[in-house]
Amino acid sequence: PAAPVLVGHSMGGMVAQKYLESHAAAGVVLMSSVPPQGLWAAALGLAFQKPGVMSDLNSLLGGGRVALDTLRSAMFAQPVTTEDLARWYKRMQPESHRAIWDMTLFNLPLKSRMTLPPLLVLGAEHDTLIPASQVEMTARHYGVEAEIFPGMGHGLMLERDWERPAGRILDWLGEQGL
């Protein structure tokens, strides 16, 4: 079978990076991905800049409930309806505490173990969780340029202008012959 093209968002971006340590891929798209250096810097930044959001997200990751406004603040820069937020919130589930620790410090991806395929690294100007500076750091780590979408937040694929990053991914796949 042909090697896959991986598209990973946030934690899924870390999964894609870990996959590359032991598997081949035809291409990888990292969208607002946890950086290869881990969550530590992003978590500290969020704790200092928006401590209420950080506290609520920790509760949510542990299976607790949070106000929809917290979800809106953490994920979106563009207007989003309460109905959409409620629908997405219902689909959320607790995260693995081990996975969070692994992404923070203990099991980070090692570039030396990877055979790097073509990579596209995307981020959002108003990302509260993985700021553009972290996305740019990820891109530099892999020797590519980050592409930051203005006026968008962490939930790139759910924002009102989701077609902009989706279109860029489609264009990139074509450029790579994928």
Please name every model-derived segment.
Residues T115, V121-G123, D127:
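Short beta-strand/loop motif that positions the catalytic acidic residue
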